[in-house]
């Protein structure tokens, strides 16, 4: 009896003494930017109906509740208005209720604002995964603040613009979302406390989930009805590749021989190797299967090979056949290489010969193909001779030019080659208007032959002839110019470009001159000399036979006749 009585007393004592349970929750983290508002909530529940005390763990000081302080307690919330870097530390909240004591701690870190507007990863809130069906981004922690609309949104530190972006309450909606919308989004709003406004920003990443799709198989290699050439005894490797889309699905790429899978065909020298899965440039799933035939035989050419690709959309096959490849005839290859080398050498030699003897070849071709050509250009003369008739020199110099113009040129070009020349003083009748006749004769000539000599004096008549001839050749493009330079028998005086008109100087620099020097020409009337070859090359094709054609008839068919043969 005494023992039972004692046990009852102990039970009564236990029931009359209040019981307290202490509940502690792990430490959480929170962060903010300097000079912005930061509000954190006690990690423990029950603070809304029970008193909450906050302590700064670094100093074990209790944080006041008076709102006039920069940091104060409001129920279960701790407010930093605004936050400073030195506020960083561990804060502990204590919730007291009749049944228990709950404690929680927060590791608060206040950062300086990044100078380059790039938010580091440790200051980012949870990432939002978007899609075409869900393109909503929520501004984090906004529910803790006393905020008013609107909320401003930024992407990668740039304000969002355009009709695709819609801000509603604490959400951002993006229409027609795609991969270009991925990035870091920052919401910016205003918190109001005791009539004072504080700025709050929060950043989180947004990614777009790729929506997969599947398509009917597309074989990218080999082409349909592809033919592979292979030599007997060699190894043939043929790849079968196909793409199916981007979604996860059942796919297969394989080879068949006579509609039978390689594994069931029963020949060890014919194997199928699966290649690695690959993705194309547009993200599609592609598979490859390699058919390897070791030691190709004659029977392999009669088999039917199929590259097969399949998924739930269907099956597609590309037939492939083998064809015998003739072995390379190395002897024939040597002959071809040697022939091409000889041909190349011949072409090079021919080019060099033509470059060296081009004038001779051109004259020969002209004499053979077009010895006399009827020209319907309305021209009366083949060439008009322009020469200086007054000199600052001796009479001997004047006589040599006059003799060359009136005797040497006509004797060779008219008598031997059949050209018709117009020479001032020979073909112009007395009593005619010299200026009119000169201009008309130049206009009716196919070539303008300038005879240039040292110490030329620009007489009125000579200057006028030059002006008309150069205008016809350079401006009207009505004729061509031949420049003959009379070189003296010595080095004392040569042709000076400064004595010529500007247009004539330009022609001399562009096309050069044909030089005549009596002491360098063994036979002054020989058509085989370098001088007369160059003159004939620049002259047009004669339209009439030479005056001595009757004498030269028994000879070769050359147009220009060389009197040294008679």
From Swiss-Prot:
The modification Phosphoserine is found at residue 441. InterPro entries: Ig-like_dom (IPR007110), Ig-like_dom_sf (IPR036179), Ig-like_fold (IPR013783), Ig_sub (IPR003599), Ig_sub2 (IPR003598), IL-1_rcpt_fam (IPR015621), IL-1_rcpt_I/II-typ (IPR004074), TIR_dom (IPR000157). Its EC number is 3.2.2.6. It catalyses: NAD(+) + H2O = ADP-D-ribose + nicotinamide + H(+). Keywords: Cell membrane, Disulfide bond, Glycoprotein, Hydrolase, Immunoglobulin domain, Isopeptide bond, Membrane, NAD, Phosphoprotein, Receptor, Repeat, Secreted, Signal, Transmembrane, Transmembrane helix, Ubl conjugation. Disulfide bonds join 42-93, 117-157, 139-187, 240-307, 243-286. There is a cross-link at residue 325 (Glycyl lysine isopeptide (Lys-Gly) (interchain with G-Cter in ubiquitin)). It is an enzyme of class 3 (hydrolase). Its main location: membrane. The chain crosses the membrane at residues 332-354. Residues 204-216 are annotated as: Flexible linker. The keyword Chaperone does not apply. Glycans are attached at residues 107, 146, 194, 225, 258, 277. GO terms for cellular component: cell surface; external side of plasma membrane; extracellular space; plasma membrane. The TIR domain mediates NAD(+) hydrolase (NADase) activity. Self-association of TIR domains is required for NADase activity. Interacts with MYD88, IRAK1, IRAK4, and TRAF6. Bound to its ligand IL-33, interacts with IL1RAP to form the minimal interleukin-33 signaling complex with a 1:1:1 stoichiometry. Interacts with KIT (bound to KITLG/SCF). A mast cell-specific KITLG/SCF-induced interleukin-33 signaling complex contains IL1RL1, IL1RAP, KIT and MYD88. Interacts with TMED1. This is Interleukin-1 receptor-like 1.
């Amino acid at each position: 009896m005494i023992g039972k009585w004692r046990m009852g007393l102990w039970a009564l004592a236990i029931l009359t003494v209040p019981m307290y349970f202490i509940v502690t929750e792990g430490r959480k983290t929170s962060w903010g930017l300097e000079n912005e508002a930061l509000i954190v909530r006690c990690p423990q529940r029950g603070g809304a109906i029970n008193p909450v005390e906050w302590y700064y763990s670094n100093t074990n000081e209790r944080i006041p509740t008076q709102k006039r302080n920069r940091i104060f307690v409001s129920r279960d919330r701790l407010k930093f208005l605004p936050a400073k870097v030195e506020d960083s530390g561990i804060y502990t909240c204590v919730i007291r209720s009749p049944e228990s004591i709950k404690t929680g701690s927060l590791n608060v870190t206040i950062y300086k604002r990044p100078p380059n507007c790039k938010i580091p990863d440790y200051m980012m809130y949870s990432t939002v995964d978007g899609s075409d069906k869900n393109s909503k981004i929520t501004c984090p922690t906004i529910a803790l603040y006393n905020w008013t609309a609107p909320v401003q949104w930024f992407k990668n530190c740039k304000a969002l613009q355009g009709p695709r972006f819609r801000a509603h309450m604490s959400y951002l909606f993006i229409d027609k979302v795609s991969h270009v919308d991925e990035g870091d989004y920052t919401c910016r709003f205003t918190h109001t406390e005791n009539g004072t406004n504080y700025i709050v920003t929060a950043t989180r990443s947004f990614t777009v989930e790729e929506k997969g799709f599947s398509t009917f198989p597309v074989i990218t290699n080999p082409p349909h009805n592809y033919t592979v050439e292979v030599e007997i005894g060699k190894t043939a490797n043929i790849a079968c590749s196909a793409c199916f889309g981007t979604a996860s699905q059942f796919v297969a790429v394989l080879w068949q021989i006579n509609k039978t899978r390689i594994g069931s065909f029963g020949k060890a020298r014919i194997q199928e190797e699966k290649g690695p899965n690959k993705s194309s440039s547009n993200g599609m799933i592609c598979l490859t299967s390699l058919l390897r035939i070791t030691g190709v035989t004659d029977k392999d050419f009669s088999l039917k090979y199929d590259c097969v690709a399949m998924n739930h959309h269907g099956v597609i096959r590309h037939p492939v056949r083998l064809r015998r490849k003739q072995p390379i005839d190395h002897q024939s290859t040597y002959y071809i290489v040697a022939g091409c080398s000889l041909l190349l050498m011949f072409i090079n030699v021919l080019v060099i010969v033509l470059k060296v003897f081009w004038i001779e070849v051109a004259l020969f071709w002209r004499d053979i193909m077009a010895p006399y050509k009827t020209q319907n250009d309305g021209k009366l003369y083949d060439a008009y001779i322009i020469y200086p008739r007054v000199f600052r020199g001796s009479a001997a110099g004047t006589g040599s030019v006059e003799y060359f113009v009136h005797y040497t040129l006509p004797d060779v070009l008219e008598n031997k080659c059949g050209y018709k020349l117009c020479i001032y003083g020979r073909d112009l009748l007395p009593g005619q208007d010299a200026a009119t006749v000169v201009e008309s004769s130049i206009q009716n000539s196919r070539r303008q032959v300038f005879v240039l000599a040292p110490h030329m004096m620009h007489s009125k008549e000579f200057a006028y002839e030059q002006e008309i001839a150069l205008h016809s050749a350079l401006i009207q493009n009505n004729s061509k110019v031949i420049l003959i330079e009379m070189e003296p028998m010595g080095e004392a005086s040569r042709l000076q470009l400064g004595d010529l008109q500007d247009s004539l100087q330009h022609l001399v620099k562009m096309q050069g001159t044909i030089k005549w020097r009596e002491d360098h020409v063994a036979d002054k009337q020989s058509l085989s000399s370098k001088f007369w070859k160059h003159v004939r090359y620049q002259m047009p094709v004669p339209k009439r036979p030479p005056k001595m054609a009757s004498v030269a008839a028994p000879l070769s068919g050359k147009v220009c006749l060389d009197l040294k043969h008679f």
